[in-house]
Amino acid sequence: MYYLIILVLLFLAELFYFRVADRCNIIDKPNERSSHTKVTLRGGGIIFYFGALAYFLTSDFEYPWFLLALTLVTFISFVDDIKSTGQMTRLLFHFSAMVMMFYQWGLFSLSWWWIVIALIVCTGIINAYNFMDGINGITGGYSLVILAALAYINKEVVTFVEADFIYTVICSVLVFCFFNFRKRAKCFAGDVGSVSIAFILLFLIGRLIIRTGDFSWIVLLSVYGVDSVLTIIHRLMLHENIGLPHRKHLYQIMANELKIPHIMVSSIYMAVQAIIIVGYIMCLGYGYWYLAGIILLLCFLYICFMKKYFGLHQST
């Protein structure tokens, strides 16, 4: 009953946001870099924040530093969806939020170099998640796969967080998917959505890694990770400014040049990541070997795909 109430309340909150976004003209207009062709409401992913907030309010205010950190990144990302903010301003908010999250993790009891590594990794993951949010269904669907895996791991493998937290966030993702995981999306996640869900997943995966002392759990983000990193390398090889928008991700070429429906592309990413996670859980004793093998396999598939189809992008 608790989750049904949460689901209904989040659904109503999303509908209320649509009215606000429509009235305030918070929209995403298509351009030459877009993978969509119609004006669509932006910022629907703000519901992820409200999912985390709902858990916080019903759990005797658990994880206060994390919630404060999430509030910071959600706020600056939402502002950025409305009007562009400076890069230094965003970095200040993000770094401040990450420091708070590290404190919630208990990371400051470790050596200082762990903090540096965590800052680099977390910044990279948040940016990657933001870059990968470009077609209908991909952010919500991919996040749903990871959250479902985390719920299973938390129950059957090792307990690293209260289960209600994961399930409440899943409710928010289901609400978003109802409006976004379709041919004609009612809304896009916006920076507020992609950044906030990335931050939530980082918090959960970070707790899992700290609890087990095993960094190979990062395999949960391997598909996004390989696509993002290799696309950056590819653009550097093409002497492009990697700070500018583009349409060179593998999923973008599938959707734009190969004309594969957005939902199909998103489903492929979901399925591949789900298969990888199942394989990892079956090979828990060989986590790092499995991670290395998966990265090599994904890199090989990425390179083969680009060799065959990138010419289509160059000709457009």
What are the residue ranges of the model-derived segments?
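C-terminal membrane-associated helical module and adjoining short loops/tails
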Residues: 210-316
